[in-house]
Amino acid sequence: GITACNTVDPPNIIVILADDLGYGELSSYGSTELNTPGIDQLATDGIRFTQGYCTSATCTPSRYGILTGEYPWKNERARILRGDAPLILKPGMLTLPSILNEAGYTTAVIGKWHLGLGNGNVNWNERVSPGPAEVGFDYSYILAATQDRTPTVLLENQKVIGLSQNDPLEVSYKNNFEGEPTGKNNPEMLKMHPSHGHNQSITNGISRIGYQRGGKSAMWIDEDLADTFTNVAVNFIRENKENPFFIYFTLHQ
């Protein structure tokens, strides 16, 4: 005989991870100082959680937990990483994107990565590996660590965007490069004054944690980052709307 069954199209999945967002900073959670109508609509149409627990509330550990399902404190390397830190996810390990990939989803990470790249001695002037592709992502458009750390460049599919071969990028978290200004030594170059050690390499008048040299054509503009990531995410949705997709959309601080 013939057995009939209903088939359900797999839903598209978008995980939006906000950076340094407090529980009471959304108007749907009682804020009177900030108005967040877009997020409030998501809460109205979906589920608003009023009690929850986080295994970690800091950069790298929270991202490690989300992508692996493991407690981040079980991995001693899951701490707030430097911008030149090696990848702390094992290539080929079971991750949220790799599981969805096997289920037929096209997967993407867009935004702040901060899980390390490469094996510890990164050449930023070629494809950096291992990275998102080696742990389940088909597409990546990321900043390596945080907005306040070097390198202040974006990578698409693990290659620095807009980098000139005539001006190679170098990154160090040990020593400054000869002749390069810093927030500590050149405060007259700053439009925003540092705190808590953010007094090293300068990009866009803002001093960062860590040192870098070269790569001038690839440096991001801080004020454009939110729009850039949003536009990339929207384009990814349009290009993949005919098939199920997963986007890990990780906003920077």
What annotation goes with each model-predicted range?
Residues I2-Q253:
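Formylglycine-dependent sulfatase
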